[in-house]
């Protein structure tokens, strides 16, 4: 068996996630494509595919149980993180992957073609210039340095009165929370357990007040 698959299976076994055979094969295929393209396009600073399984795949998958709704957008998706792993886990949900760099969007189009992922739309745009036809149930990002920037730049993206922001962070960002704009409030903070990942991971769920 492919060493990446062996490692992925071992990591998943340390979580409570249910991942099908097809999903596991797609996740391994994604890592293989990321490794191949990374050599020419410098898509991630993580060079070792085994390390990608922990820092990129599992780090994204642990968000999976917390997705409520049908339509999601991954802002500043880069090479598709966390969007591609989450789309693989939720074939019944729609994902828009937004990034401003053409090389990343080209990579994402290759991924969804090669792995036959039918629920992802890659879009090349700056977030402030992206004007969706309708709002999203969840606005995901692990790219923003600050949650204040995230909610300010993305405030036009969630569904009115229903959509939420989902910020993936390291240590619990209490300092950042105090700096959030008046209209935004923290709905929940989830401590995430990522097998073999050093350091803390948290998912901060934010929504518009009122």
From Swiss-Prot:
Keywords assigned by UniProt, alphabetized: Cytoplasm, Methyltransferase, rRNA processing, S-adenosyl-L-methionine, Transferase
Catalytically driven reaction(s): guanosine(527) in 16S rRNA + S-adenosyl-L-methionine = N(7)-methylguanosine(527) in 16S rRNA + S-adenosyl-L-homocysteine
Short name of any one Pfam family annotated for the protein: GidB
Enzyme Commission number(s) of this protein: 2.1.1.170
Coiled-coil boundaries: none
Cross-referenced PANTHER family: S-ADENOSYL-L-METHIONINE-DEPENDENT METHYLTRANSFERASES SUPERFAMILY PROTEIN (PTHR31760:SF0)
Enzyme class, broadest EC rank: transferase
Gene that encodes it: rsmG
Sequence positions that bind S-adenosyl-L-methionine: 76, 81, 127-128, 142
NCBIfam families hit by this protein: rsmG_gidB (TIGR00138)
Name the UniProt record assigns to this protein: Ribosomal RNA small subunit methyltransferase G
Keyword S-adenosyl-L-methionine: yes
Role according to the record: Specifically methylates the N7 position of guanine in position 527 of 16S rRNA.
Subcellular location: Cytoplasm
InterPro entries listed in its UniProt record: rRNA_ssu_MeTfrase_G, SAM-dependent_MTases_sf
Family classification: Belongs to the methyltransferase superfamily. RNA methyltransferase RsmG family.
Main localisation: cytoplasm
Example of a GO MF term: rRNA (guanine-N7-)-methyltransferase activity
The keyword Transferase is assigned to this record: yes
GO cellular component, one term: cytosol
